[in-house]
């Protein structure tokens, strides 16, 4: 009740929609949960068995024709109030901690090495959280957003909710 899927969107069998919104051209895979107040933008591609937690914003694209949509791969969990926008991608089985912002220009950094893994792409089976890193400009030092991969998981580990909660809590991330 209270959910809207616009004409021209596609919801696979078994999709669960709480009061939420799926826009035209979006594709939502089987067994996916679109939780309360989550929004799936135009042409976004959401895989199978994904959980979009409360208030998640998945960006959309309608134009230009060569714009890159958001892709959330199978089995991912997108935490409450995350924003994933045009051209960003979340890999299979990955977890974004609550409030994470991901776009194509935001660096994704490995917490163990400090190395930049990619921009706008969280690899498969990673636990990632929003963070910031110091940058120097003529006007001073400022902290710019980044996404920090705090753990890489095996495929089976992703579905152990107790282990996942412990990983997040060990790093001070709300679950």
Where are the language model's segments positioned?
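Terminal amphipathic alpha-helical/low-complexity segments used for targeting or macromolecular assembly
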Residues: 1, 124-125, 130-175
């Amino acid at each position: 009740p209270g959910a809207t899927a616009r004409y021209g969107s596609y919801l696979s069998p078994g999709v669960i929609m709480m009061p939420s919104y799926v826009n035209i051209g979006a594709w939502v895979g089987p067994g996916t949960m679109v939780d309360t107040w989550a929004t799936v933008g135009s042409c976004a591609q959401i895989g199978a068995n994904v959980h979009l937690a409360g208030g998640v914003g998945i960006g959309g694209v309608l134009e230009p024709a060569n714009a890159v949509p958001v892709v959330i791969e199978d089995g991912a969990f997108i935490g409450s109030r995350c924003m994933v926008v045009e051209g960003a991608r979340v890999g299979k089985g990955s977890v974004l901690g609550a409030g994470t912002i991901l776009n194509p220009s935001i660096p994704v950094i490995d917490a163990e090495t400090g190395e930049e893994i990619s921009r706008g792409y969280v690899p498969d089976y990673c636990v990632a959280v929003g963070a910031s890193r110091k940058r120097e400009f003529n006007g001073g030092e400022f902290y710019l957003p980044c996404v920090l991969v705090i753990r890489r998981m095996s495929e089976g580990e992703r579905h152990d909710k107790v282990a996942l909660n412990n990983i997040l809590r060990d790093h001070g991330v709300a679950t």
